[in-house]
Amino acid sequence: CLHYGHLQHLEAAKKMGDILWVSVTDDLHVNKGPGRPIYPQEHRAALVKALRCVDKVITVSGLMEALEFVKPSILVKGTDYRNGLADYHEKYCRKHGIRIAFTDTPKLSATDMILEAMKR
């Protein structure tokens, strides 16, 4: 589910470049557990596109597909990726001159927020 942490991350990413492309993982490739995703890819993409900071949205099977389609100059990831992307993502970025940057926004989990709210 789209939440405030996503908005913070996307606003920070927008400040790093001119056009902010956001990739939404398609329903078939979302790895969040049984019964997920809760919302279909079209709904998730529409919600992301509605954010003022987002210029373009694509639905993809994974990061490699997004990189090959967009051909960005910068790949911006959240703090949870600071310990490293998959080796093949890093190699692809190096080979194609794509700078990897990270936002400093805190990692939030929609599932954790929902579970915490249910305890109240």
Predicted regions and their residues:
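Nucleotidyltransferase catalytic core that binds NTPs
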Residues: 1-120
